[in-house]
Amino acid sequence: MALHSMRKARERWSFIRALHKGSAAAPALQKDSKKRVFSGIQPTGILHLGNYLGAIESWVRLQDEYDSVLYSIVDLHSITVPQDPAVLRQSILDMTAVLLACGINPEKSILFQQSQVSEHTQLSWILSCMVRLPRLQHLHQWKAKTTKQKHDGTVGLLTYPVLQAADILLYKSTHVPVGEDQVQHMELVQDLAQGFNKKYGEFFPVPESILTSMKKVKSLRDPSAKMSKSDPDKLATVRITDSPEEIVQKFRKAVTDFTSEVTYDPAGRAGVSNIVAVHAAVTGLSVEEVVRRSAGMNTARYKLAVADAVIEKFAPIKREIEKLKLDKDHLEKVLQIGSAKAKELAYTVCQEVKKLVGFL
């Protein structure tokens, strides 16, 4: 069994080595059982327009492109900042409902709760013993978050990227959908995989990034910043559960400029261009087609047209979320089944890692 596993690992390594290290644009793939996708999302905060267009839509698509797909509600990551236990418990179920409503299908992918698979933390510890402290301290997100917290970040926040690497490598994932702000963390994952392989023999595939074609959705109030769950300005972020009235209000108040024409110029007209990009994404039209159809419309009217398109896109998802949240038992069962499937995969890999390291 060990020889078979090592042979399979070499096959995966040969495939990965044939690709250049780094990020790759999302390929149009036939289903391939030799490839595995992993991604995760924190349960805290309500899913917003940027999350949906930048991540969840591609998650749904990837289910049909790969035979092996795992999506995790990464609750361990969420406690790097203080959480109310009761709120966190409910947030996990709420995020499960949202993901299912958006199109994540447990028949096509494994949807599970990270904390219910203890191998994540076991592998994280092993990997943390292979990375130097300065490497983690120089990551952009660590510096940004500790600056915001007045340099009072926890050890958990510092080692967050190592747990993230363990999440990915634990399932011998070959592909990871990521946003632009996660590229540096993916480089750490790749380096840890290569470092482990160099020390213990070729075992982990070196995962490739799948960059979403949708650029980061910007804040409606500050187009220089990305849309965020934690933005204190309530008008900045469009949440998937917002009412039609709230969505209209947020787009009406969206920052643009003093030119009334609708054009796409991210460098020169960031606010309008952000709204055009959102419009294109929710309708499936190209940016050029959106601009063409908006000829003669001023930005005030155009913002309301985009609000209507977003409302139409989210309406069936909202209805399904409300329906799913009424059935707590179903949501818990989905997570239990998914976590059991993930545990089966994780246990095998973790046992092999323990043998290689010398624990067994």
From Swiss-Prot:
Gene3D superfamilies: HUPs (3.40.50.620), Tyrosyl-Transfer RNA Synthetase (1.10.240.10)
Record carries keyword Transmembrane: no
Keywords: Aminoacyl-tRNA synthetase, ATP-binding, Disease variant, Dystonia, Ligase, Mitochondrion, Nucleotide-binding, Parkinsonism, Primary mitochondrial disease, Protein biosynthesis, Transit peptide
Binding site residues for L-tryptophan: 167
CDD domains, sorted: TrpRS_core
Main location: mitochondrion
Effect of residue 352 to K: In NEMMLAS; uncertain significance
Catalyzed chemical reaction(s): tRNA(Trp) + L-tryptophan + ATP = L-tryptophyl-tRNA(Trp) + AMP + diphosphate + H(+)
Gene Ontology cellular-component terms listed: mitochondrial matrix; mitochondrion; nucleoplasm; plasma membrane
InterPro entries: aa-tRNA-synth_I_CS, aa-tRNA-synth_Ic, Rossmann-like_a/b/a_fold, Trp-tRNA-ligase, Trp-tRNA-ligase_bac-type, Trp-tRNA_synthetase
Binding residues for ATP: 42, 48-51, 179-181, 217, 226-230
SUPFAM superfamilies assigned: Nucleotidylyl transferase
Example of a GO biological process term: positive regulation of angiogenesis
Compartment annotation: Mitochondrion matrix; Mitochondrion
Tissue expr: Brain.
GO-annotated molecular function: ATP binding; tryptophan-tRNA ligase activity
One Pfam family cited in the UniProt record for this chain: tRNA-synt_1b
Protein name listed in UniProt: Tryptophan--tRNA ligase, mitochondrial
Encoding gene (name): WARS2
